[in-house]
């Protein structure tokens, strides 16, 4: 493994250097073998005797851990200085193919930015983040991922006493909108410029020599954010806490906390029980994405003219709608756009809202429909079967215009409509067993989530509607 730390070497004063605080009797609970292989890691690194590498007791050569400082808007209100309160950027892994990945250890102990926290993470939240990153990655949504989950005998006090844990998160970058806000609101505009130049140099090197590099860069940040959120909306993912300090400059989904996937199609779903006003509801995410980009634009106002910032921001909605429309047409089995496609989509979504239909299962079942069937077996899932039959007939006539075989259409539709997603109750079942040192449920769920688009009878039980108790789970920011 080859590591360095360009953040440390190139950005003086943007962080505090310190070492992780190891946990009591730490042990490696689980890891992603697939990600380890992609990173070129020897499987022997995950033997019990090497737990120190994943628990902060031992640093690999070239690692220089540090805590980053940033600020942000939380629930629409300026929160001031935040920063890595329990996580450390260990270093950047350099792969032979030129790719670079941050290694970030979460739950690594107190930092100067811990505020009132204890610097620790609990097993419950680390497993939720691990599973979320894996699920989103295999759904094709840009995301951070987690390599390892470490548990311990160290008690951590939240609503109850829980096991202290650590998560090793891997991402191309951990730069957030809030990094730029921090220095802007401190009046350190030269550091805003320095940070922008750093990000462009390392992640947009093709723009370094461009005269309008800041405009071109910010425009791409806007577009990436739009595409990320379009992906969220297409798979029914609600992030839960879209504060500006949780927004990636690369358009990656990260900082998984009180997230959730739609069960019943409820556009107003609020998955964070601390979000009393519904600011971060599922249907509000596209709007919040733009609001957050406006906050970033404000922080970058010293780098571009107001006209340039408006020009970049103006690209958000068209790109969001283009990408979302493309994904939703694919979910309906439509290759080429037609003028009535939006009516077909809204007709189905309205019917699903009225009926309380399961979002993931409804689209997956539609993928299996045969276009010569005058009546779909899906109708039995609906109370108002006449309304469904009416919609189905319109959809069927539209699909026939595509002039594709059932087999071809079904295959492409299945690639747009997962058979299973990470429902909260599935994660909870895996967590409860893992807390008893039984990782069998976790491992099985992880394997299933790596094949979300497959017809996999062995995982059919994971693709069902949640039981009643599973619909009533509440998730908070507590982690």
From Swiss-Prot:
Nucleotidyltransferase involved in the post-translational modification of proteins. It can catalyze the addition of adenosine monophosphate (AMP) or uridine monophosphate (UMP) to a protein, resulting in modifications known as AMPylation and UMPylation. Its EC number is 2.7.7.-, 2.7.7.108. Belongs to the SELO family. The active site is at 245 (proton acceptor). It catalyses: L-seryl-[protein] + ATP = 3-O-(5'-adenylyl)-L-seryl-[protein] + diphosphate; L-threonyl-[protein] + ATP = 3-O-(5'-adenylyl)-L-threonyl-[protein] + diphosphate; L-tyrosyl-[protein] + ATP = O-(5'-adenylyl)-L-tyrosyl-[protein] + diphosphate; L-histidyl-[protein] + UTP = N(tele)-(5'-uridylyl)-L-histidyl-[protein] + diphosphate. Keywords: ATP-binding, Magnesium, Manganese, Metal-binding, Nucleotide-binding, Nucleotidyltransferase, Transferase. Its cofactor is Mg(2+); Mn(2+). HAMAP family: YdiU_SelO. This is Protein nucleotidyltransferase YdiU. ATP binds at residues 83, 85-86, 106, 118-119, 169, 176, 255. It comes from Erwinia tasmaniensis (strain DSM 17950 / CFBP 7177 / CIP 109463 / NCPPB 4357 / Et1/99). Mg(2+) binds at residues 246, 255. PANTHER family: PROTEIN ADENYLYLTRANSFERASE SELO, MITOCHONDRIAL (PTHR32057:SF14). One of its GO terms (molecular function) is AMPylase activity. Disulfide bonds: none annotated.
